Amino acid sequence: RDVAPSRGLGDVYKRQVLGYIPAGSTNDFASTLGIPKNMIKAAAKISDGKVMSYDIGVMNGRYFNYVAAFGLFTDVSYKTPQNVKNVLGHQAYVFESLKSLSNIKSYYLTIHCNEIEMKGSYIYGMISNSRSVGGVKDICGKDVELDDGLFEVTLVKEPVSPLELQQIVAGLLSKNQKSPMVERFKTDRIVIESDKAVEWTVDGENGDAHQRVEISVVDKAIDIMV
């Protein structure tokens, strides 16, 4: 998981230069920043690397490091037993994700973003600032900039046929990133509302259930050695 940096964000927001040593199973945060997954090599980066600034997010007053998401697969990280993750690593997430396919749940949402209102049924949503999520590189596109004051938004519509489900998979994993079932855009602020509380995950941890979520970007908030 990649939760350690986000847990301390509120305390270090006084502006300090951070070092990060990855110790999780997937390590999206380290992968995005180009930090070695080897702990000794990562420690060396802290001493002889360079300082980089990157954006963080705020969801209903809670700081997060690189991703806030709801829907399909998002409970995998914190529901997968730690001993299983220790043994299988990234494969543990894959196995748990496959279980979710048998219980696809949709959410009817009203989304306010970039002076536009959208309404529809979605099975997955992700607001992120990362080149890797769940161990999948470039899932948010190839033009991700970590310090541009914008986060990438990915919304997956509810499929009503096997063909649409196939289009979703292709849209998320293919390099052209285009699918009628997957909406993508950038923003510095988004509000998502629903009639019922929706479970969220934040940096791989339980983010609680919310009927209304407001997410905004804190531009170049953190300095880190890379």
Give residue spans per PLM region:
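Glycine-rich phosphate/pyrophosphate-binding beta-alpha loops
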Residues: 69, 73, 126-142, 206
